[in-house]
Amino acid sequence: EEGTVTVAFSDGTNAQAKILGRDTVTDLAVIKAEGVSGLKPATLGSSAELRVGQDVIAIGSPFGLESTVTTGIVSALNRPVESSDASGDNATVFPAVQTDAAINPGNSGGPLIDMAGNVIGINSAIRTNSSASGSIGLGFAIPVDLARNVAQQLVEGKKVEHAKIGVTVTPATEEDELTGIGAEIREVQDGGAGDDAGLKAGDIITALNGIPVASSSALVASVRGHQPGDVVEITYLRDGKTETAKVTLDSDGGELSEE
């Protein structure tokens, strides 16, 4: 909450920066360097056009080593990733771009770019095990289309609005209680998007726009990849039968965001 932000430039100069706004849902913020002009912005690409297997480059300052460049490929798309701050609070869930490009502490906030130099993601998180604290080839980036939408709202001085269905869900599994099959609806908000589409408690959502949803976090991540007002197709199980419904996504009103 307190402290200063200093931006370091490649020519060795520094500048103080002002935080224009931040969004705790995606753990993104927009800052403005004070008294600086003539900066050349990076070119933003489109994460919607990404394909698994294409080459990517991650840039950052892992462990304080400035301007470190690592390479890899897009390992997966729409990977539901949940991360929290050091206290274990403020969990964020987003539909990540997974990459095997080495990402370590200090890479967060740096760009993931394609081979044409376009930013296609913002490096955000890694998966590690108990015996390793650095990269094991499982890195995750916030898709640039989502980041662009968040940044635009913050620059305009708004609280960031995220899409929602208006349902409370829990993971649904096979009889082995291990294999995820979807997100089971426990509660439907009266007058919400899910209610208007005819969804009911007990329904198990298995896909969104044809992309499988294997858990409740996967559903949250998929929805957050869209904007309020988008129309999506929900596939769900009801009494053992597969049904579909068109849902016009609601807005959370910016209640989860923070300026």
Each model region followed by its residue ranges:
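Short, charged beta-turn/beta-strand-edge "cap" motif at the junction between a beta-strand
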Residues: 62-65, 211-214, 240
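Serine-dependent protease modules
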Residues: 1-177, 190, 217-220, 224, ...
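A structural signal for beta-strand boundary/capping segments at domain termini and interdomain linkers
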Residues: 12-14, 231, 242-244
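C-terminal tail/sorting-segment detector
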Residues: 246-248
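Conserved PDZ fold ligand-binding element
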Residues: 194-216
